[in-house]
A protein has these predicted regions:
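Buried, small/hydrophobic-residue-enriched core segments of structured protein domains
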Residues: 1-204
Length: 204
């Protein structure tokens, strides 16, 4: 369908997150300067606008992805914008839901979404619901363990010996507030041609 759209300029993006973020895409297509404003609309809202002009009715139906390591069978659901997240999650098989382990529901993805309670609601612009382990457990002297089952982008843990292993990440921060350490990892992973460390220092 998108390939048949006329009168528009098309740009194609691929790669890992955050290649799909509109801010990153704008940065690479036509970077904005101070004081400029850019309007964006996603494909589902284009369809919403089209249905309104075609029928004269506001139809807020949308497709939402139910994802996350705690969902045994990720899939898509048709819902109304602002629907209760319970109406989506209860249709799925949630891993460990019956053995007392908690899980966190996120309206959106794990990096940019927001936590919602089981009786909460999907955000108007939300296209995804993510369910991950709550991380309400603690390790005794975890800092002194080899951490063979913990993910790290550096070689802090011995898990770098198994680079193909897939991990189930939870919300446990493994400690409290720590000092900001300059490691160069922000420069390595940020997909923009800026100096992230200087930006973070200016913000802090």
């Amino acid at each position: 369908v998108l390939e048949q759209v006329k009168g528009v300029e098309k740009h194609y993006f691929s790669g890992p997150h955050p290649a799909g973020n509109v801010g990153v895409q704008i940065h690479h297509v036509d970077p904005i300067s101070k004081g400029e404003i850019v309007w964006t609309v996603d494909i589902q809202n284009v369809a919403l606008i089209g249905r309104f002009f075609r029928t004269g009715r506001v139809d807020l139906r949308k497709i939402v992805a139910l994802t996350g390591s705690e969902i045994l069978e990720p899939r898509y659901y048709e819902v109304i914008s602002g629907a209760p997240v319970s109406s989506i999650v209860r249709k799925a098989d949630v891993r460990n839901a019956s053995d007392g382990h908690g899980y966190r529901i996120i309206s959106g993805n794990v990096l940019t979404g927001r936590r919602v309670e089981p009786d909460g609601y999907l955000g108007f612009y939300g296209n995804q619901v993510t369910v991950i382990p709550e991380g309400d457990h603690f390790e005794f002297l975890g800092w002194g363990m080899p951490r063979l089952d913990k993910f790290s982008v550096s070689r802090s843990y011995f898990s770098w010996l198994t680079p193909r292993k897939r991990y189930v990440l939870d919300t446990n921060m493994n400690g409290g507030v720590r000092a900001y350490v300059v490691t160069g990892l922000y420069d390595k992973y940020l997909p923009m041609d800026i100096y992230p460390l200087y930006l973070l220092k200016a913000i802090l």
